[in-house]
Amino acid sequence: MRAALFWTAIAVASTATGVAAAADNLKGTYGLVGAQVCLVAPAGFKQDSNGNLTIPIGETNHSQLTTEGLVIYHGDGTGEARQTFVTIVPPPNPHGAAVSAGTISYSFTYTPEGDNAYRMALKPGSFQGMLNAGPNAGQQFSIEGESRLFRVSDDRKKITVAIDKPYVQKITFSGSSQPVPRICTSISNQSLVDESVTVGKGR
């Protein structure tokens, strides 16, 4: 029951990714704020008439999240992020309403996709999450499957990020080998904090 509640409560926003007009020279630290909503379907999703996995199977629940953090671009098409988040699971919910909070960190790559637009992908095995408040405080988790589109201003000082198409993420919690499928919507904004890649390293 507690694990099921946690699946609902955690909607980690790996929303902290973006790129610049020249992917090979985007370098610096950006501050991030964002929001995310996830639909969790423990039994998975089936295809719609166009072949997209968008139709939930069986019972579902949803969660709402806000996040803040730092994103560091290394200047070589790779980056890393560290974020905090607060998640609310509103009623009605089969496992009850809940509030949770925690931290995440991950590494990513990004590739060009149109004018000033780029596609982000998580580096496999790099995502680490920890719940430090809520019904399942102390639970660790990881996420597989992440794709976001971001657009960068010409001066590289601002980045907008969004999930632009539905896809299934899989979130796995410590103590369980069974990943939980979900589909999320997400938006975030980033602003240049410093051209250094060491800002916030002590967070």
State where each predicted segment sits.
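Bacterial N-terminal signal peptides that target proteins for export
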Residues: M1-W7
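Bacterial N-terminal signal peptides
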Residues: W7-A16
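Mature soluble binding/inhibitory domains
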Residues: A21-R203
